[in-house]
């Protein structure tokens, strides 16, 4: 039996889809958002918070042998630091402990490239680049790095585990939240773009890689999962063209970004709403960050990434269908 945490998220949902397609029995847990209806007798779902140790023990009694840990909080709002640390560190520690206690055969833990260190601009980041406090610009990155340390602790205590560090995951998820928000912004003809560069990857590729790593003998390794390094301008242009919408034409400068995130922080203090832009997201949007994906290809030589252009065209097609059905 396989356990998937964070089953209602973009990646968790895709992972469950692929596992069920392989006729594998899956137990999925979720916290606030219920899972979509997979309509499969192979799937069992439980409402269980990863901070609930007793609840996790009950779930593990289903005869769990493999764990895919996708559950996490993603936020770049400085006010949510406590929540980030609680869920991404303590929650991961609970999963590791549950796996050790149940004697699972393997854990695949979803980390993030935010848990890696930073280099000078234009130098590609690989898995050996260590996270440092000086190079860190987000509480999220720190929480994911410390979450990885919990997995390494588990490995030290005899757990077989691998960690995946995806870049920005693209797919047809909830376009009011997460990385799928990029599609909504462009659809709404948001006029701004940044010339920052980042890694991007199809959600289907991330799920496929995770399953291949789980079914391999590979353990005690971390892998960057990234198809291509692209500028946000290129990504926005591809999405706009696929939707037949106006391409964003106003460039965000560092000076403008500073003004906007300060205004958003001020507004958030009074409204209690999440800021649209924070100091952390502004820094990320302007940074030119390149990722080296060669380690994964070395370990899984048969694997080929989808092109990001293909991903965007297909994802826009799914969103367009959803919009037409409303």
Provide a role label for each language-model segment:
Residues 90-139:
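Conserved Rossmann-fold NAD(P)-dependent oxidoreductase catalytic core, especially the SDR/UDP-sugar
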């Amino acid at each position: 039996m396989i356990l998937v945490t964070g089953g209602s998220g973009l990646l968790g949902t895709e992972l469950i889809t692929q596992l069920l397609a392989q006729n594998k029995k899956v137990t999925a847990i979720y916290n606030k958002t219920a899972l979509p209806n997979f309509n499969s007798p192979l799937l069992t779902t439980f409402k269980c918070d990863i901070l609930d140790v007793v609840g996790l023990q009950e779930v593990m009694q289903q005869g769990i042998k493999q764990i895919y840990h996708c559950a996490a909080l993603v936020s770049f709002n400085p006010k949510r630091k406590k929540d980030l640390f609680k869920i991404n560190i303590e929650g991961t520690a609970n999963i590791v402990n549950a796996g050790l206690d149940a004697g699972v055969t393997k854990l695949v833990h979803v980390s993030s490239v935010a848990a890696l260190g930073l280099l000078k601009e234009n130098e590609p980041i690989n898995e050996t680049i260590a996270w440092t406090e000086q190079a860190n610009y987000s509480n999220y990155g720190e929480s994911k790095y410390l979450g990885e340390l919990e997995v390494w602790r588990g490995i030290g205590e005899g757990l077989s585990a691998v960690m995946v560090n995806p870049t920005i995951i693209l797919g047809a998820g909830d376009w009011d939240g997460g990385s799928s928000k990029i599609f909504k912004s462009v659809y709404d003809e948001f006029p701004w773009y940044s010339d920052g560069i980042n890694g991007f990857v199809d959600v289907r590729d991330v799920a496929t890689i995770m399953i291949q790593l789980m079914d391999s003998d590979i353990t005690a390794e971390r892998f960057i999962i990234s198809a291509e390094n692209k500028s946000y301008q290129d990504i926005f242009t591809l999405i706009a063209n696929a939707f037949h919408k106006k391409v964003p034409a106003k460039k965000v400068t560092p000076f403008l970004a500073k003004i906007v995130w300060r205004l958003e922080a001020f507004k958030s203090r009074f409204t209690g709403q999440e800021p649209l832009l924070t100091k952390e997201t502004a820094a990320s949007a302007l940074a030119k960050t390149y990722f080296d994906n060669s380690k994964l290809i070395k370990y899984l030589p048969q694997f080929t990434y989808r092109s990001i252009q293909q991903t965007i065209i297909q994802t826009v097609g799914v969103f367009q269908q959803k919009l037409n059905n409303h």
